[in-house]
C-alpha cells in the first residue's frame, strides 16, 4: 500500500513539473532548462530553475513542499536521522587532551550538496583556565566520551518541515574539542599541556570526506555557530584553497557564520582577565592566539602589523578580505557579546547608562553589517540560531532565515551570479532597525532568571527598569501607543 502511494505521488510530482513547464512556455515563450536537465552526475531533490515563474513562485513552492513532505515517508527507511561518529584516520590530529578528533556524518546518496558544521563552545587561553575547562566541560576538550551517533535539529535536521532547503544534503557535524576558535595548528607540548589543532581538524575532515562522496560535490557550505561561526570566517577560504590544491576546483565553497560576529568594543564594566567569561574580547584573543599558535588567513594577516593578527578574529575586520561567499547571521543583542562586555541583564533595574550601552551596541553591530552582502540580523536578545528547531520562526521584515538563505543560494546560481541586484521578492540582506532588544515580535521567548516563566516584551522591558514615559517621549509617541507597538 505504502509503495503504491509513493509511486502515485511521484507520478503526480512529474505531472506538475511537466504541466508547469508547459504553462511557463506559454507565458514566457521560452524554457530555461532546469538544473536536472543540465547536470551530468545526478541532481538534488528539487533543483528547478523558477526564473520564468516569479509571479507564481509561492503557489508552486507550496505544492513542491507539500509533495516533498508527502514523499518523505517513502524514503524514511533508507534515510537515517542519526549521524555516525568517525574518528580521523590521521591520529596525529587530536583534541586538546590527545584523544582522536573526529566528525559525525549523515550521507545522502544522490545529493551533491554538503553541509559541514563547526560546533561552538567558547575557548580557554591559559594552562590554568584550560585545566578548569577540562574538569567542567571535558567533552569540549576530549573525544573519549563522545556517543557513537547523534541527531541534530535546525539546518542539520533531515525533516523537510524543519529544514526546507537542506534536509536532503550530506550533513557533517564536527565536534569542537580544540578550544581555540578553530584556529590552532599546535600539537600538545609540555609547556601548554594541551594540543590546539582546530584548523588542522577541519583540513583532515575535508580530506577524509573526499573519499566518502565529497569528490563529486557541487557545493560545500561551511557553517558554524558561536566559536564555530568565527571558525567559519577564519577557515572558509582555507577550505576552498585546500580543495583546489587537491584537484577539486569545481567544488564551490561558501560560508554560513551564526553568532560568531563579535565586536572588540569597550566593555561596559572593565575587568581583568582572571575570569575567561568576562575577559575583554581583544585581550582574550591576544592571549589565546599566542597560546594556541593560531593560523589566520594570509590575506587578512597582510592587512595588519606583525603581532596584530588577532584582528582577524573579528568579523567586520576579516570579512572584506574573504574571497568565498559568506552569509552572516547575527543577533543585534547577542548574549555572548553582552556577557564579555559585562552587561548583566538578570540584575534589575538596569541603570540608564547600561540601557544606553545596550542600545549603542545594537547600532554598532548594525553598522558593521551594512556592507555585508548577505546577512540576517534580528533585534533579539539570544545566542545561536541555525541549529535550533525554532530557526524557521524568526523573521526580519517578513522574511524567515531559511527563506533568506534560499534567496542567497539562488543569487549565486547562474545566470544571477554577476547581478548586484537582489532577486525580486527574494531578499537576503535583512537587518532590524528598531532600537532595543526583543522589539522584533518573532524573537525567541525570554524567561525570568528566577521564576523560569516566559516574559512578554513589555514585561521584559519593565524587568529591566524600562521607563515607558521617557522612552515614548524619545520616540515621539504616546506611552499607550508605544506599549501597543511593543505588544503586537
From Swiss-Prot:
Q: What residues form the catalytic site here?
A: 226 (charge relay system), 334 (charge relay system), 383 (charge relay system)
> Which regions span the lipid bilayer?
none
Q: Which GO terms describe its biological process?
A: negative regulation of canonical Wnt signaling pathway; negative regulation of Wnt signaling pathway; Wnt signaling pathway
Task: Tell me which positions the record assigns to the signal sequence.
Answer: 1-19
Superkingdom of this protein's organism: Eukaryota
The answer to whether the entry has keyword Hydrolase is: yes
Cross-referenced InterPro entries, in alphabetical order? PAE/NOTUM
GO cellular component terms, A-Z:
extracellular region
Q: What is its EC number?
A: 3.1.1.98
Cellular compartments annotated: Secreted
Q: In which tissues is it expressed?
A: Expressed in the egg and through cleavage to gastrulation stages. Enriched in the animal (prospective ectoderm) and dorsal regions in early gastrula. Shows a dynamic expression during embryogenesis, in particular during neural induction and antero-posterior (AP) patterning.
| Main enzyme class | hydrolase
Task: Report the principal subcellular site.
Answer: secreted
Q: Which Pfam families match?
A: PAE
According to the record, glycans are attached at 90
Catalytic activity, as annotated? [Wnt protein]-O-(9Z)-hexadecenoyl-L-serine + H2O = [Wnt protein]-L-serine + (9Z)-hexadecenoate + H(+)
Q: Does the keyword ATP-binding apply?
A: no
Annotated GO MF terms? palmitoleyl hydrolase activity; protein-containing complex destabilizing activity
Q: Which UniProt keywords apply?
A: Glycoprotein, Hydrolase, Secreted, Serine esterase, Signal, Wnt signaling pathway
Family assignment? Belongs to the pectinacetylesterase family. Notum subfamily.
Query: Any idea what job this protein has?
Result: Carboxylesterase that acts as a key negative regulator of the Wnt signaling pathway by specifically mediating depalmitoleoylation of WNT proteins. Serine palmitoleoylation of WNT proteins is required for efficient binding to frizzled receptors. Functions in the prospective ectoderm and is required for neural induction.
The protein's name is: Palmitoleoyl-protein carboxylesterase notum1'
The source organism is: Xenopus laevis
Q: What is the lineage of its organism?
A: Eukaryota, Metazoa, Chordata, Craniata, Vertebrata
The gene from which this protein is expressed is: notum1'
